[in-house]
């Protein structure tokens, strides 16, 4: 092994790595977290998972890409390098931010716990996220509006084109075109 290291261009970095404190972590995609809404979300379950990792002495949580998946629902098959998966948005977080009320979620479908039923999830959660977006835009006193406007201005290099693409895609019934 030393002979291999001596011939390696970044020999010093490799030697430092071999002497460094070992660390460990877990690979788990956010969608695999437990939760009542059919898919793992970036919310309280994610925070609890991080706390549990720390309690177990784990230093890293590796996740798969969180971009918006294309038709096969794979995190590696995305339609944007920048847009995130809207189904990872925490519904409880939207309730906390007063963009939804608990009753907006009713009726919550009976989701399977071992596999994600993407059709059922998308049909249900899309309408709820649309309601949250409408509530956000119609709110008289909106404390999140500055953050939203800042996000839009910082991401204008891709956001408008992506929004246009998604509208056209929806108008085409999500068919692929070239």
What are the residue ranges of the model-derived segments?
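Acidic/aromatic-lined carbohydrate-recognition and catalytic surfaces
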Residues: 2-14, 18-178
């Amino acid at each position: 092994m030393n002979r291999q290291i001596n011939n390696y261009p970044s020999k010093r970095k490799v030697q430092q790595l071999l002497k460094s404190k070992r660390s460990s972590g877990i690979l788990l995609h956010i969608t695999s977290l437990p939760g009542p809404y059919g898919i793992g979300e970036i919310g309280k379950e994610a925070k609890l998972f991080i706390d549990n990792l720390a309690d177990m002495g784990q230093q890293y949580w590796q996740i798969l890409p969180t971009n918006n998946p294309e038709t096969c629902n794979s995190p590696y098959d995305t339609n944007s390098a920048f847009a995130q998966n809207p189904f990872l948005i925490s519904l409880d977080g939207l309730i906390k931010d007063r963009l939804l009320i608990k009753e907006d979620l009713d009726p919550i479908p009976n989701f399977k716990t071992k596999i994600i039923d993407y059709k059922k999830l998308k049909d249900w959660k899309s309408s709820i996220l649309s309601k949250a977006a409408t509530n956000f835009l119609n709110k008289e006193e909106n404390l999140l509006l500055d953050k939203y406007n800042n996000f839009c201005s910082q991401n204008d290099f891709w956001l408008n084109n992506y929004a246009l693409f998604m509208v056209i895609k929806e108008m085409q019934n999500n068919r692929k075109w070239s």
